Regions:
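Extended polybasic, low-complexity segments that bind anionic RNA or targeting/receptor surfaces
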Residues: 1-47, 92-224
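A short, aromatic/hydrophobic, helix- or strand-capping loop or linear motif
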Residues: 48-52
Length: 224
């Protein structure tokens, strides 16, 4: 895998390069781990407010609708039974919390695994900027993205203070935009290409490099 990545200038061409740290962009892509983390993330997004009434909760009389024998019909004990129209639901749904506990190291490993896969597949890109002045321009953003990534689903990663670029790409149908500190395994894995601005890339690498070095130091101290 290449250890550097060309930085694309707003007007096209190369504007230098950036290093791809092996600790971030050359990690094992553990598919079962990524699946587990993505499933947990989607489960946590569920509201879990579903509720249906059981036979003990629906309105209706508790008396026997007709006598036990002599009518020719099947015996019934209540109009609130599930087989009746307006009766309660069998195994009624109750509000519940779908969130799963996922260790932080697993979440981090899943994200690095996806980013490493995109880097190995040459689907990770860095642009110097979107070449915008003080005013947003979706047209300019589209031209740059079309030159960098031609896939149907593109993830754009920006810095939080880059409001002009954010406003320029947020309404594009095939583009999903995140800030560097929001990057996660799900949004990365459902995107065909990932496009960083150089400022966002530097911020992301700096944050992850600090986390990786801290984790390595902790494990070394634990071993001693």
């Amino acid at each position: 895998m290449a250890t550097t990545l060309n930085v694309v200038a707003p007007k096209g061409g190369s504007k230098g390069s950036v290093e791809l740290p092996a600790a971030i962009f050359d990690q094992q892509t553990n598919v079962p781990l990524i699946h587990q983390v993505v499933t947990a993330q989607l489960a946590a997004a569920r509201q879990g407010t579903h509720k249906t009434k059981g036979r003990g909760e629906v309105s209706g009389s508790g008396r026997k609708p007709f006598k036990q024998k002599g009518t020719g019909r099947s015996r019934q004990g209540s109009v609130r039974a599930p087989e009746h129209r307006g009766g309660g639901m069998v195994h009624s749904l109750e509000p519940r919390d779908y969130s799963q506990r996922t260790p932080k190291k697993m979440i981090a490993a899943a994200l690095l695994g996806v980013l490493s896969d995109r880097a190995r597949g040459e689907r990770l890109h860095v642009v110097e900027s979107f070449g915008l002045d003080d005013a947003p321009s979706t047209k300019t953003a589209i031209e740059l993205l079309d030159a960098v990534a031609t896939s149907k689903n593109v993830l754009v990663v920006l810095e939080r203070n880059d409001e002009v670029s954010f406003k320029s790409v947020r309404n594009l149908k095939h583009v999903h935009v995140l800030f560097a500190d929001q990057l996660n395994a799900y949004d990365a894995v459902v995107s065909d290409d990932i496009v960083f601005t150089k400022a966002a890339f530097d911020a992301f690498v700096a944050a992850k490099s600090g986390a990786v070095s801290t984790g390595s130091t902790t494990e070394k101290e634990a071993g001693e």
